[in-house]
C-alpha cells in the first residue's frame, strides 16, 4: 500500500479523498469510468487518467483551505517519483503524470512535445468546478492519448454516458474486482473506481 512507500502519500491521499467528495460528485465520475470500461476501455490507463485529472482539479482548492497541504503534496510527489519513476516511464499516461509532478516540484513546464498539450489541458482543469468537466477531460485524454480509435470504433462521450444500469448489471465484473462479489458486482466496481481516484501513487 501507499503507506509503506511514504506516510506523506497516505496523508495526501486521505486529504484529497475528502476534498474530492466535497467539490465533485465522485459516484457520478466513477459511473462514467465504469461505463467506459464496460465499452472496452483499458481500466488501468483510464484509472491513471482519472487520478491525474482529480489531482489537477482538487489540489488548489485544498491548498486554499489548509495551509500545510502544499508541503505534504510536495513530499508525497517526491516519494512517488523516488518509488515509481521507472514504472511511470513505461506508459504515455505515466509520462504525463511525471511531467505534472515535476512541474509541481520545480516550476518547470515539460519540454517533451508529446506531453505539452495534455499538460496544458491539466493546468486548465485546476479551475474546474463541475464533475462534467472532469468527465470530459478524462474522455478527451483517453481518446487522444491511449486509444485514438476508441471514438470511431465505439462512440463518443454521449454514447458512453448512454450505457444503462441494466447493461452494467448484466456484465461480468469479477475479473475487474479486487474481491469476490456475488451480487451488485457493478456497484462494487463503481465504489472501487471511486476510491482509486484519490490515490496518486502508481
Predicted regions and their residues:
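Short, functionally important secondary-structure microenvironments
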Residues: 1-202
